């Protein structure tokens, strides 16, 4: 009986993880296509005054200008994180953690695709960022998904909900 329950949980959590990841990735891709076709480089379109603006940039690094020009490192790191998520995903203990890992997976895929395929070239691509808040780096949907995942993971951890089962459980 426990094996059947575990199988059902695994199927549900995998479905949740991959559905969330797919949704984030598609939304990120669609909004980046829209931003590139609609916004001009470095122009500010005020949506909510100076609080929320649309500003298109092509980011060669990560948030806060970290690792600018280290696209290959960021690409490899992203691939390692994705492989780690896939390795541990069969042992996810709850739908909440499946959502967290789905958000992270979708966010990583969104920025990884940019790094691999966008200009200036393969494995040197710049990430499309286009949303701006005051005193914060310009970001995109993928970045937002990763931040939301971090916040949800803090709540789950505070509630003592473990992310994965131990080997042999």
Name each model-derived stretch.
Residues 1-169:
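Alpha-helical transmembrane bundles and membrane-interface segments of multipass inner-membrane proteins
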């Amino acid at each position: 009986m426990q094996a059947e329950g575990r199988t059902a949980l695994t199927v549900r959590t995998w479905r949740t993880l991959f559905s969330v990841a797919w949704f984030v990735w598609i939304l990120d891709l669609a909004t980046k296509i829209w931003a590139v076709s609609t916004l001009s480089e470095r122009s500010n379109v005020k949506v909510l005054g100076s609080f929320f603006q649309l500003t298109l940039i092509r980011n060669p690094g990560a948030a806060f200008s970290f690792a600018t020009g280290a696209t290959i490192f960021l690409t490899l790191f992203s691939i390692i994180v994705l492989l780690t998520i896939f390795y541990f995903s069969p042992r996810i203990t709850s739908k909440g953690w499946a959502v967290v890992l789905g958000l992270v997976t979708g966010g990583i895929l969104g920025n990884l695709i940019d790094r691999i395929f966008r200009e200036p070239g393969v494995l040197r691509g710049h990430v499309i960022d286009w949303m701006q808040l005051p005193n914060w780096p310009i970001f995109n949907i993928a970045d937002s998904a990763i931040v939301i995942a971090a916040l949800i993971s803090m709540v789950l951890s505070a509630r003592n909900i473990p992310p994965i089962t131990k080997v042999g459980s």
